[in-house]
Amino acid sequence: MPKVAYSDEDRERIRMQLVTVGLELMAKQGIQHTTVEQVYKKVGISRTFFYSFFATKEDLIVETLYLQQPKIIKYVQTLMADPALSWRDAVKQFLHACCYGEKNGIAVLTIEEQQLIFKRLSKESYQVFRQKQLRLFGEILENFGIRADTA
């Protein structure tokens, strides 16, 4: 089969599709039950082409988690802006969504999945992930009116 030359725009569009489809599948069926094969087949590319975007499944997982961060912040803001919810109820609803994310379209990592991912990420990817995670948690706390400690 002849190789297809993809423009930078095509590659970026395909990469975004992989991340979006990955997030949809992971939110619906869980991270452990989502396979790389499901993702690349749904996007309509080959396994080899998938790995030109992501070296490992864990790299894809991390990118899907980055993609959902703004969605999580928006969800917190929506809860806090709801006059029908007390602060306590907003926090309770948020925590429930985090624990049962698949029902709310949020991909949630178990402790075991986190540990497995951390082992397989490069040192640089791990550091970037932790920094982005800390920023996310700080922003969540601030949206709930809790001053995040920057230490």
Where are the model-predicted features located?
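Alpha-helical DNA-contacting segments of helix-turn-helix folds
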Residues: 17, 54, 59-68, 75, ...
